[in-house]
Regions:
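Catalytic alpha/beta core domains of metabolic enzymes, predominantly
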Residues: 145-146, 157-267
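A general structural signal for well-ordered alpha-helical segments in protein cores
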Residues: 77, 81, 106, 191, ...
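Residue-level signal for alpha-helical context at structural boundaries
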Residues: 63, 95, 102, 161, ...
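Residue-level detector of family-conserved "landmark" positions at structurally sensitive sites
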Residues: 62, 123, 154, 226, ...
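C-terminal alpha-helical cap/extension of soluble enzyme domains
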Residues: 2-3, 7-17, 27-31, 55-57, ...
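Surface-exposed charge patches
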Residues: 50, 111, 214, 239, ...
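Active-site beta->alpha loop and helix N-cap motifs at the rims of alpha/beta catalytic domains
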Residues: 3, 7-161, 171, 180, ...
């Protein structure tokens, strides 16, 4: 891990950075689908993009844990960026997570991701155990300062081996103004103080599938980066909440909460079953695994089929409304 910059100071430094629109709303992070030969399936990726755009998403993300990033080669990751950018065609911003473990590796990846159409990049604490927090901040700060794209930082203590404190994230943002958003994952009560403090100058996104989506909104978050299988419901929750219809937003959240809970027990289960639910809702008949994959059970597939019937299909047409099945489920009529 390359650590060449000075340690961050807990004071704000004035730097000139380009102004950008604030990010908000629902930015689903796509699954990686494979063909029977184990190679990436571009058509399935494009179908996901279409479904998310049809649901009215505000952006699209790639290459996080949901995308099985550590199963992909660097070239495969960049292929996904290029394919997604071509399909999105500038309609919403595209953010790509950076998985390389050196400063130069990350900067090389960011440069190429920008060339292929990414608008933002997301950095994570490098997966190197035993490194002092200050050194992790130096690493992230150097990449952010030299990145040709605006940067977000994901901190996920529940699903990542290395994470940093909320105070460290605040210092990182103060000292490196190219860091424009944070994905702060964890129980809403744990991140609320951070979200309210940071959201004055930084866009704060929740995660964990949106399991606390309305609570996250109350706590100061401006957006959500979930897996895509509930994108229509979660975009509608955002729309209702933003228009002041908070009770209807809460009702819709309660309707899909059992499905989110089913997916949230463990990351391998989300990848195995969430991907299959997304496939069912998009009309894909077969999901091919890239081995090794956690085994799916017949009962699990039955449950996913039941969820798909409750939710109804995802439509690719722009401005597609919630399915009648999902409206009935939420009592929205």
């Amino acid at each position: 891990m390359e650590l060449q910059s000075q340690p961050p100071k807990l004071v704000e430094e004035e730097r000139s950075v380009p102004s950008l629109p604030r990010l908000s709303g629902v930015h689903p992070i796509l699954y990686a689908f494979y063909g029977p030969d184990g190679r990436l399936d571009r058509a399935a990726l494009e179908r996901q993009v279409d479904a998310c755009l049809g649901a009215g998403c505000h952006g699209i993300a790639l290459l996080g844990l949901v995308t099985e990033v550590f199963r992909l080669s660097t070239e495969e990751r960049l292929d996904l960026v290029g394919w997604a950018a071509a399909r999105i065609a500038g309609r919403v911003p595209l953010m790509a997570t950076v998985a390389e473990v050196s400063v130069h590796g990350q900067l090389d990846f960011i440069t190429e991701a920008k060339r292929r159409g990414a608008d933002w990049v997301v950095l994570q604490p490098p997966p190197v155990k035993g490194v002092p927090e200050r050194e992790i901040l130096r690493f992230l700060g150097e990449v952010a300062d030299r990145s040709p794209l605006p940067v977000g930082v994901q901190n996920n203590p529940l699903n990542m081996e290395v994470s940093v404190s909320s105070d460290a994230l605040l210092a990182l943002h103060r000292n490196h103004p190219n860091i424009r958003f944070m994905k702060a994952e964890g129980p809403a009560v744990s991140v609320a103080g951070f979200a309210r403090e940071a959201s004055r100058t930084c866009d704060i996104f929740a995660g964990h599938g949106g399991i606390e989506w309305p609570t996250n909104l109350r706590s100061g978050c401006q957006g959500l980066i979930p897996a895509p299988e509930l994108v229509d419901a979660q975009v509608e929750i955002w729309r209702l909440w933003s228009s002041g219809e908070t009770e209807r937003a809460e009702a819709l959240h309660r309707a899909v909460l059992p499905i989110i809970a089913f997916m949230s027990r463990a990351l391998p289960l989300l990848v195995a079953y969430g991907k299959r639910l997304m496939a069912m809702r998009m009309g894909l008949e077969t999901v091919h695994a890239r081995l090794p994959e956690p085994g799916v059970t017949s009962f699990g597939i039955e449950e996913i089929g039941r969820f798909a019937a409750l939710l109804g299909p995802l439509h690719a047409e722009p401005g597609a409304a919630l399915s009648p099945a999902l409206k009935r489920l939420a009592g929205l009529g």
